[in-house]
């Protein structure tokens, strides 16, 4: 069994894999010689879904399972993992725009002086964070604004002289 793409990265859109099943020299036909089903682990149990009718399936980063079950002269069941990887927040398609006329010395000093409110202080410096390579329906011309707390968190850098965005949810990595 081959599945493509092999290593998709989160892009906001549904990523239904192309599946080819071959036994010897015979390429099997879906719904004739085998059935294809999908599942994802939810709360410790496999939740099945049909990506043709559930447009929210195979969208988010995570591990999914494809099951091939033989029929009409073919028997057995094959399980294949299909992983949609988190997108790295340091990817060039993720753009960070800062507010104009920021007094960085004051902002960084305020954030360092009050660590409990550092995130709010630093957030006020960011105009927007957006992903310019999205394929989901609610992206406008491939661009979607990211949401703090859902797609990234913000903190004072380890040096105390800058900010760090840390990917969360469908995003991973750090951006300084």
Regions found by a protein language model. Name each.
Residues 1-176:
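Solvent-exposed beta-strand/loop surfaces, strongest in extracytoplasmic domains of secreted
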């Amino acid at each position: 069994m081959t599945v493509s793409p092999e290593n998709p990265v989160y892009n906001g859109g549904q990523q239904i894999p192309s599946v080819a099943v071959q036994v010897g020299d015979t390429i099997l036909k879906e719904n004739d010689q085998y059935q294809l089903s999908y599942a994802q682990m939810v709360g410790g149990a496999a939740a099945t879904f049909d990506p043709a009718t559930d447009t929210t399936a195979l969208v988010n980063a995570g591990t999914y399972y494809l099951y091939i079950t033989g029929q009409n002269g073919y028997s057995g069941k094959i399980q294949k993992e299909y992983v949609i990887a988190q997108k790295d927040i340091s990817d060039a398609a993720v753009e960070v725009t800062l507010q104009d006329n920021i007094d960085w010395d004051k902002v960084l000093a305020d954030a360092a002086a009050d660590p409990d409110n550092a995130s709010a202080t630093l957030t006020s410096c960011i105009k927007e964070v957006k992903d310019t390579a999205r394929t989901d329906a609610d992206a406008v011309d491939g661009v979607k604004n990211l949401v703090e707390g859902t797609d990234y968190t913000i903190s004072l850098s380890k040096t105390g002289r800058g900010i760090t965005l840390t990917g969360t949810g469908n995003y991973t990595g750090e951006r300084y």
